[in-house]
Amino acid sequence: MVSNVRNDVTGNWRIATIAENIEMQDYALDYYKGYFKSDDEIHAIVNFNYKTTTKISVMGNLLDVSVYEYVDKEEHDAKLLFSGKLLKEYHVNKDTGEIEEIQ
């Protein structure tokens, strides 16, 4: 279930929590097609299995998929979201599904 983020001042942040063995860079395009209502949105997916928070945002024809270390209780406050250490970043082509590791 995707919901709004508490204390988000932009109105564009959404959050979902999961406990799955999913690599978000592989799932990002399907997630985008299913849950994004606007390319202005920024989505956070907290995965309690991996203790990560993934940020998905749109950059033209690419999805920017950034995976961060999970910070305790960050799912409850926009000010804490994405405050963990950046672990990996990927670009996913929205047209082809091609995944490029950025860092």
What is the meaning of each model-derived region?
Residues 11, 60-61, 97:
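Intrinsic-disorder/low-complexity loop/linker signature
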Residues 44-92:
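Exposed beta-strand-loop-beta-strand "reactive/processing" segments of non-cytosolic proteins
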Residues 21, 74-76, 100:
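Contiguous hydrophobic segments
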Residues 1-52:
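Short, non-transmembrane alpha-helical segments in secretory-pathway proteins
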Residues 91-103:
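Short, low-complexity, Pro/Ser/Thr/Gly-rich segments in the mature regions of secreted, periplasmic
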